[in-house]
């Protein structure tokens, strides 16, 4: 008997820029200042694995630890059971970390209970905050509401199969970022995750009981419904539903579990709380779930959500399902995180608008996602391709990268001038074409004066490319003559320093070198 509790905190925070670094350029510092105090929804995810007992997993809300003198049940004092549970948790941790998709970090005792100057997760939960300098707040339980300090809680629960849709899935289509030809797939519970723009906690519980005992109890319930079917047709319908559940479990080998999910939001403004209540209901409706605003069980569910206290969850607030369907109700998205790599560029999260440091070159190769650093920027006219390229190139240059650009529309002339003026002409060199001063190059100029075979072949290939059309293949005699002319010219400029290496002198010497043998041999 154990409980898997996934607790996702979504807290409104403001972006704090780092503008004190001396190496920041004018544009980088202006970028940081532009996003100063930008609000965004930060995500903190916790996963709690709790060992419980058969008796405690069946207790209801009227018999929690709040009503008893002994908090720890006697069964937990069994060292052998505790050792087996800890070993199972260790195996679970290794499996998750080895997957490469999720990283689990086990919390130390000081991170749970807190220490001087730093709050633990229990203290953060009681204050509905994730800051390290939280202050404890009074918790008020009133007939009409529950308060934590100045914040008023609003709770929506998924605790009955009648509130769930007819079918669930691992993912769903997100219309805002999807097109006619491509789908943006998010998890089934994404509407109550990062897409719900308010302070809230999304609790997801899976109660793993004795699978065989659960099916045995369902068999007994089905027989009872069968015997009472003559008194009510509803009993016959329920019996058929139970039989279908049992058939699925036996034929497909599915694990019977109990599940519960709730969204706990809060605000210190009653008018804003009304808006939040409507937003939560709308997001649940997007999941095709029936919004159930729970005003009675808020204190009990808040108490059961304390890290490590999941065993006090009231059994009447859970429903039976299978393990796969229960996992579909888990939130699987988070907001983007900054890369740990020192090399990267600043990008902005399209959902929250928060700047992030992203490495799109080295980190994907280290993780095996890509095998090269090529980038293909695709978009219609006016979509910001050149704007993004300017942004990327500038930051790469500021981090020491060597950049060579071929600019066909003067899109990067301004950036080059900025770098040129800032470096006093050392960088930001921009070659452009004009009728008076066209772009030219000299393949015959070599600083050390050494021409190897590769250099000679590249010069010959260049001249053939300029000479012949794409669909016109050179003759063998032309290739031999050109190769001899290039070799003779290179030998000439090596022996005679008065000859300036360029196309003009090559043409003049080629006329002499090629025309004379041609006349003697009558080659056409």
Identify the residue ranges that each predicted region occupies.
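Extended, folded cores of ATP/NTP-driven motor/assembly subunits in large transport
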Residues: 1-333
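Single conserved hydrophobic/aromatic residue that forms the stacking wall/gate
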Residues: 512-524
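Glycine-rich phosphate-binding loop of nucleotide-binding enzymes
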Residues: 1, 342-432
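Short, well-ordered alpha-helical packing segments
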Residues: 86-93, 97, 264, 277-281, ...
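Switch/coupling segment of Walker-type NTPase motor domains
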Residues: 4-17, 35-36, 391-495
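Hydrophobic alpha-helical scaffolding
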Residues: 75-78, 82, 232-235, 266, ...
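A glycine-rich phosphate-binding loop feature that marks nucleotide/adenosyl-phosphate handling sites
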Residues: 108-116, 296-304, 413-415, 477-486, ...
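Long, K/E/R/D-enriched contiguous segments that form extended
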Residues: 490-511
């Amino acid at each position: 008997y154990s409980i898997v509790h996934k607790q996702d905190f979504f807290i409104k925070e403001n972006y704090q820029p780092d503008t004190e670094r001396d190496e920041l350029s004018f544009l980088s510092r202006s970028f940081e200042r532009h996003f100063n105090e930008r609000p965004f929804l930060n995500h903190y995810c916790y996963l709690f694995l709790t060992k419980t007992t058969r008796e405690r997993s069946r207790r209801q809300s009227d018999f929690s630890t709040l009503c008893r003198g002994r908090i720890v049940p006697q069964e937990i004092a069994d060292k052998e059971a505790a050792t087996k549970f800890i070993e199972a948790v260790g195996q679970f941790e290794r499996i998750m970390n080895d997957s490469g998709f999720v990283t689990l970090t086990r919390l130390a005792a000081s991170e749970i209970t807190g220490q001087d100057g730093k709050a633990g997760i229990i203290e953060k939960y009681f204050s509905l905050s994730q800051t390290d300098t939280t202050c404890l707040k009074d918790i008020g339980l009133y007939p009409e509401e529950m308060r934590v300090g100045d914040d008023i809680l609003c709770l929506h629960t998924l605790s009955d199969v009648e509130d769930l849709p007819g079918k669930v899935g691992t993912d769903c289509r997100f219309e805002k970022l999807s097109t006619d030809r491509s789908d943006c797939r998010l998890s089934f519970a994404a509407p109550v995750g990062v897409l719900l723009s308010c302070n809230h906690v999304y609790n997801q519980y899976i109660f793993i009981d004795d699978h065989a005992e659960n099916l045995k109890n369902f068999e007994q319930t089905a027989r009872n419904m069968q015997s009472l079917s003559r008194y009510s047709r509803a009993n016959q319908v329920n019996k058929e539903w139970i039989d279908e559940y049992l058939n699925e479990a036996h034929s497909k080998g599915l694990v019977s579990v109990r599940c519960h999910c709730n969204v706990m939001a809060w605000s210190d403004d009653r008018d804003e709380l009304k808006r939040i209540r409507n937003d939560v209901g709308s997001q649940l409706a997007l999941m095709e779930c029936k919004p159930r605003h729970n005003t009675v069980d808020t204190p009990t569910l808040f108490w059961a959500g304390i890290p490590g206290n999941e065993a006090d969850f009231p059994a009447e607030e859970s429903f039976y399902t299978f393990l796969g369907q229960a996992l579909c109700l888990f939130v699987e998205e988070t907001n983007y995180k900054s890369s740990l790599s020192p090399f990267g560029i600043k990008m902005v999260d399209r959902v929250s608008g928060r700047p992030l440091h992203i490495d799109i070159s080295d980190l994907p190769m280290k993780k095996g996602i890509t095998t090269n650093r090529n980038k293909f920027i695709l978009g219609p006219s006016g979509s910001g391709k050149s704007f993004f390229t300017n942004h990327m190139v500038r930051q790469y240059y500021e981090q020491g990268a060597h950049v060579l650009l071929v600019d066909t529309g003067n899109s990067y002339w301004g950036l080059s001038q900025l770098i040129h003026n800032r470096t006093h002409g050392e960088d930001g060199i921009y070659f452009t074409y004009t009728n008076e001063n066209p772009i030219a190059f000299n393949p015959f100029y070599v600083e050390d004066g050494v021409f190897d075979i590769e250099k000679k072949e590249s010069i010959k290939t260049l001249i053939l490319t300029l000479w012949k059309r794409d669909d016109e293949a050179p003759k063998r005699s032309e290739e031999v003559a050109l190769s001899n002319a290039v070799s003779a010219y290179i030998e000439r400029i090596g022996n005679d320093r008065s000859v300036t290496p360029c196309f003009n002198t090559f043409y003049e010497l080629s006329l002499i070198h090629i025309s004379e043998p041609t006349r003697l041999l009558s080659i056409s």
